[in-house]
Amino acid sequence: MFTGIIEELGSVVDVREGGLTVRAAKVLEDAAQGDSICINGVCLTLTAMSGSTFTVDTVPETRRRTNLGDLRPGDPVNLERALRPSDRMGGHFVQGHVEGTGRVKSVTEDGPALLIGFSAGPELMRYIVAKGFIAIDGASLTVVDRDDAGFSVTIIPLTQELSLIHI
């Protein structure tokens, strides 16, 4: 279980059919093999660690339902360690079991923030509620508005700075 509060941006070092190797610092401070780690909103098991890198396995279903199959070496990724019972709950409960992906359809400056519109199919839209929460690439966000074809969220400057959600 995660909170959707991104702890750091990692960098993809290697991509193979069955997994990824990522460079990170903070999320490895107290990590151990077998721990759950959230990469771009996906709960994965840390299978190996070496210095400042860690490896996770990805199965075909994960690569089909998420953006992990599109990653290449050098790409940034949002990272978060699993929630502990004593942690602050700053976002919302994020299981890391991704239902699917949407597509950016519009980006509008809204003061210092960005209003981003997404399109998503009916299989996802039935779960999305205006003023409810959603995790996009693992970041906990509030749904501004929705209709049958999509939804919008606002990205505050701090989220733009600390995550890979910036345009």
What are these regions (language model features)?
Residues 1-165:
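Conserved loop->alpha-helix
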